[in-house]
């Protein structure tokens, strides 16, 4: 993907590496990346290019154990991600008038946990995890373990994503039951991680617009996929 040179500023918020994309504006998008990604992932770069052209500023940051924080050893937990997203939101609200969200994969899930009661203008989700418990159950089946075995082992490593029992308990205790923000969702037709029926159920329940890219995957990384994502965004950024 050819990347344009953008106006960006590297800062730290409570020690967390952050990039502010674009010039000061009265509207800002808070962006949360997915697993094995970072604050400068291709999809966030595309978002920044498209959003800046529409007059937005974008804030992206590295989640625990990602990007500049790969040295961290503590298992990434949802409650810590919620805490950090709230820090970013507080910063954004001090520097702009309207805050919107972008979330990719698990980043979208953490935003769902964090912002159900916040003042949010608009939301754009790419390949969002809308039901983390189902994904964990799918991984448990893949690893051929029961919940009882999982509880005893606490951590189960595999070739997809490690399973951690306290994470699972948190997910079960924090279901997504409220989401009233105007939300646009893009997923790939062949996304096997966030299955169609799960995402469709979420979209129907909370009145979200759902778009599929034909032959698309969970990870939007090819030029064709990113071009589709860019066009989709540009039609929905106002």
List each language-model region with its residue ranges.
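The alpha/beta-hydrolase serine catalytic core
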Residues: 4, 118-201, 205-212, 216-220, ...
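Active-site glycine-rich loops that stabilize anionic/oxyanionic intermediates
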Residues: 26, 33-38, 189
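Conserved alpha/beta-hydrolase
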Residues: 48-70
């Amino acid at each position: 993907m050819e990347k344009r040179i953008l106006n960006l500023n590297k800062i730290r918020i409570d020690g967390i590496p952050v990039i502010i994309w674009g010039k000061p504006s009265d509207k800002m998008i808070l962006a949360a990346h997915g697993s094995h990604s970072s604050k400068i992932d291709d999809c966030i770069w595309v978002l920044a290019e498209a959003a800046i052209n529409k007059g937005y500023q974008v804030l992206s940051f590295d989640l625990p154990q990602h990007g500049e924080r790969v040295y961290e050893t503590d298992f990434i937990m949802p409650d810590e991600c919620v805490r950090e997203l709230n820090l970013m939101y507080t910063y954004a609200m001090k520097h702009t008038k309207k805050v919107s969200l972008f979330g990719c994969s698990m980043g979208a899930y953490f935003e769902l946990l964090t912002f159900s009661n916040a003042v949010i203008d608009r939301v754009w989700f790419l390949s969002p995890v809308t039901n983390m418990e189902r994904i964990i159950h799918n991984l448990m089946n893949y690893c051929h373990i029961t919940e009882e075995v999982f509880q005893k082992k606490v951590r189960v490593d595999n070739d997809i994503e490690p399973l951690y029992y306290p994470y699972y308990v948190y997910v079960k205790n924090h279901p997504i039951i409220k989401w009233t923000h105007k939300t646009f969702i893009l997923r790939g037709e062949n996304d096997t991680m966030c299955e169609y029926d799960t995402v469709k159920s979420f979209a129907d329940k909370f009145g979200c617009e759902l778009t599929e890219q034909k032959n698309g995957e969970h990870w939007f990384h090819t030029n064709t996929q990113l071009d589709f994502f860019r066009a989709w965004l540009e039609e929905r950024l106002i």
